[in-house]
């Protein structure tokens, strides 16, 4: 009996140690494995290049930093983005997009919307609030809350929600301020949880850019990496019209060519392709056609090319 009791005690201790290890070491291990920086740093830039860089207002249209379990205010050796490194890089504007769902086996070619979700486990290991367990909308709101907390605790980061606020940040930088404008965006509008009223709620939380799709088809329409290759649904059309009426920037970086064309035909506002490449230069599924890129540019749109 004593031996059995000792065995059960040992099993309990080992189980508790495993749980403790998962919750303490798991978040860093996950980001190290999944948020990798590829390649080496290359040659150091010339003095002229550094001087030019320092003279510019540098903007990055895409970063998933809020997904990970670490403070943006502390320098990290994981990933690429935190406030100390943004200051080093003379960043003026940083778009911070929130990831709320990622299909298992995610790839550029074809993903099922019914595939198991990677973010559910990530959120569990990173101890996200219970409300985020089954709601993509709550996952977006949680990450937005994190950004607002970081900004409140920093003299170098401000959450910007209007063109006037952005102008003020850029003006302050002319006076040697190092203030960084942080903007909120969604990585796919499945974060609406199928409810158009959530557009207003996300807007009130500070979101000023919404991408329509990510790596899978959703209620708004087809993804560039989904299975249907369809255009906007009726729900998608309603969502796009509402976003546009509120002044929300619409990002089509992961949308099917049919969705991109539908959006161009539906509204007159400029679009954003926040992170992409040119299909004529790199012919793969990740990049939309040069013809669509030209239509977006002719409309006054903004295209962010990965490097």
Label for each model-derived stretch:
Residues 280:
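Active-site environment of non-heme Fe oxygenases that use a 2-His-1-carboxylate facial triad
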Residues 213, 253, 274-276, 306:
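Generic beta-strand/beta-sheet core signal
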Residues 2-227, 283-306:
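N-terminal hydrophobic targeting/anchoring segments and the immediately downstream early-domain regions
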């Amino acid at each position: 009996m004593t031996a059995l009791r000792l065995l059960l005690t040992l099993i309990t201790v080992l189980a508790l140690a495993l749980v403790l290890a998962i919750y303490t070491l798991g978040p860093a291990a996950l980001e190290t494995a999944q948020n990798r920086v590829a390649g080496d740093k290359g040659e150091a830039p010339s003095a002229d290049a550094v001087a030019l860089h320092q003279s510019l207002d540098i903007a990055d249209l895409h970063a998933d930093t809020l997904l990970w379990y670490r403070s943006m205010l502390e320098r990290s050796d994981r990933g690429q983005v935190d406030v100390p490194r943004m200051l080093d890089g003379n960043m003026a504007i940083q778009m911070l997009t929130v990831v709320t769902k990622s299909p298992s086996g995610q790839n550029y070619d074809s993903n099922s919307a019914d595939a198991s979700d990677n973010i559910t486990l990530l959120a569990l290991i990173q101890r996200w609030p219970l409300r985020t367990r089954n709601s993509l909308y709550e996952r977006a709101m949680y990450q937005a809350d994190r950004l607002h907390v970081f900004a409140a605790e920093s003299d170098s980061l401000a959450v910007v929600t209007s063109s006037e606020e952005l102008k003020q940040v850029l003006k302050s930088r002319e006076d040697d301020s190092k203030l960084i404008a942080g903007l909120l965006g969604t990585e796919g509008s499945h974060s609406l949880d199928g409810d158009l009223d959530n557009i207003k709620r996300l807007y009130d939380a500070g979101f000023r850019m919404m991408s329509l799709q990510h790596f899978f088809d959703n209620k708004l329409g087809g993804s560039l990496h989904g299975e249907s290759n369809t255009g906007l649904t009726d729900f998608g059309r309603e969502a796009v019209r509402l976003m546009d009426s509120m002044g929300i920037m619409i990002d089509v970086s992961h949308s099917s060519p049919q969705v991109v064309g539908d959006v161009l035909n539906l509204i007159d506002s400029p679009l954003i392709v926040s992170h992409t490449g040119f299909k004529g230069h790199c012919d793969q599924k990740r990049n939309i056609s040069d013809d669509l890129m030209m239509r977006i540019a002719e409309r006054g749109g903004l295209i962010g090319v990965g490097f």
